[in-house]
Amino acid sequence: MAPFWIALQFLTILPIELKTIPTAQQNGRAILFYPLVGLIIGGILFLVTCIFVKLPALLLAAIVFALWIWLTGGLHLDGLADTADAWVGGFGDKLRTLQIMKDPSCGPIGVLSIVIVCLLKFALIYVLIEQHQS
């Protein structure tokens, strides 16, 4: 059961306290539980949506979107920014690409990729809520 808790701790900000430091094998097995953690996150977001369904669609979409980012700690957005920066900045140079990915700062392409993905996620959440409410 440790791999599940490792996955939940890694992919969310939920206060999961592991009794020991995970082994490489346990970390590898944790990947198998990523879909389940995604289902849990989706379930929480769905539950919040159902509870506050009477709110205006725009407000509810903003709440759900913010909760989604908060629950995951923005982990995927950080990875997206690193990848976008490295892909554009290190184009054709593998060593430069890896250097850019390790750099803690975020370049303009990284910021732009986050903005675009966040706008799309927010718009899609809004459309889903609006269609359900009508």
Describe the role of every protein-language-model region.
Residues G73-G79:
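Juxtamembrane membrane-interface segments at transmembrane alpha-helix termini
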Residues M1-G73, G89-R96, D103-S134:
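Hydrophobic alpha-helical transmembrane segments
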